[in-house]
Amino acid sequence: MDYSENVQNKNFTPISQPPNLTRDQEHAIMVSTLRQVISNTGGDTSSSHYIAASEALPPSDAGPCPLCGVTSCYGCAFPQHEEIKQEKKHKGVRKKPSGKWSAEIWDPSTRTRRWLGTFPTAEMAADAYDEAAAALVEKRSARRGSKKGEGSIHQEVGGGDD
């Protein structure tokens, strides 16, 4: 029996292992490769996908990433990471699948979430949350009453009988 196929060739050089990529990074590479195939661009079709993907990634000895500070970070080079960085986070505000923004606030007196509405922008939803939070603070301070010598948070200006 000939077992020559199990013997390694002395001229064989092993291919270096690909870097550990996250699922999002692999997905981005596959999508860009498919776009190149569908649009019939991308140059030489005989080159391996790993080589094409590794050219899109920054070199591993590039130093720490300016966004996250991790050495040899591959995630910050992808657009999904940049989009996440650009979004501001507002308390009580979340983005719905439809692209609109919803706002809600926890009402401790009724122990329920109070729906504030759906808004076209995150800033409008945050403003609605801020107004509702201010109303809750007013309600709480009015319920507690002001102590002797202390004024309320929102003092009335003028219009009083002297």
UniProtKB/Swiss-Prot annotation:
Keywords: Activator, DNA-binding, Ethylene signaling pathway, Nucleus, Transcription, Transcription regulation. One of its GO terms (biological process) is ethylene-activated signaling pathway. Its main location: nucleus. PROSITE patterns: AP2_ERF. GO terms for cellular component: nucleus. It is found in: Nucleus. This is Putative ethylene-responsive transcription factor ERF121. It comes from Arabidopsis thaliana.
